[in-house]
Curated annotation (Swiss-Prot):
Record's protein name: PTS system glucose-specific EIIA component
Entry text on domains: The EIIA domain is phosphorylated by phospho-HPr on a histidyl residue. Then, it transfers the phosphoryl group to the EIIB domain.
Residues forming coiled coils: none
Top-level taxon of the source organism: Bacteria
Protein localization: Cytoplasm
UniProt site (Important for phospho-donor activity): 71
Species per Swiss-Prot/TrEMBL record: Staphylococcus aureus (strain MSSA476)
High-level lineage: Bacteria, Bacillati, Bacillota, Bacilli, Bacillales
Pfam families: PTS_EIIA_1
InterPro entries assigned: Dup_hybrid_motif, PTS_EIIA_1_perm, PTS_EIIA_component
Length: 166
């Protein structure tokens, strides 16, 4: 009550929508051709088989981590949700080749803000797969996760998950 009266503190929403960060074909997590992701060892989520080489922010929050090899970005929402956007499979071995990171750790982002551009053809030819996992890495802190089974998805526009944090 005092927070509302005196304007101190920020009301944090427990519910958050996760939008697809890539345009392409929705892939169920169980169908990602990598057991670390398919068996949910890193957390719950989904994959996208991209049709273009731009990643946008799937949530409003901040950039928590930009991997030195440019193939993945960690994001954190105000409500504590942590999200990993991993471009392709076994792309760490490319050592940043074919990727252009557009943000830095600590940057505030909104849904649809560009994060990374990548050369889709290069990754298709040099990595295990272009299928890109999007993973909630702190699934244990979520009260509920509802994943929508989509087909074709559009970056920054198609909502794919609703999460309620504890």
């Amino acid at each position: 009550m005092f927070k509302k009266l005196f304007g101190k503190g920020k009301e944090v929403q427990k519910d958050i929508a996760i939008y697809t960060p890539l345009t392409g074909e929705f892939v169920k997590i169980e169908d990602i051709p990598d057991p670390v992701f398919a068996q949910k060892m890193m957390g719950e989520g989904f994959g996208i088989n991209p049709t273009e080489g731009e990643v946008v922010s799937p949530i409003a929050g901040r950039v928590d981590n930009v991997f030195p090899t440019k193939h993945a970005i960690g994001l954190k929402a105000d409500n504590g949700l942590e999200l990993l956007v991993h471009i392709g499979l076994d792309t760490v071995q490319l050592d940043g080749e074919g990727f252009e990171v557009l943000v830095s750790s600590g940057d505030e982002v909104n849904v649809g803000d560009p994060l990374v551009r990548f050369n889709l053809e290069y990754i298709n030819n040099n990595a295990k797969s272009v299928i890109s996992p999007i993973i909630i890495t702190n699934t244990d802190q979520a009260a509920s996760i509802n994943i929508y089974d989509e087909n074709a998805v559009i970056k920054g526009e198609t909502k794919v998950i609703d999460v309620t944090m504890n």
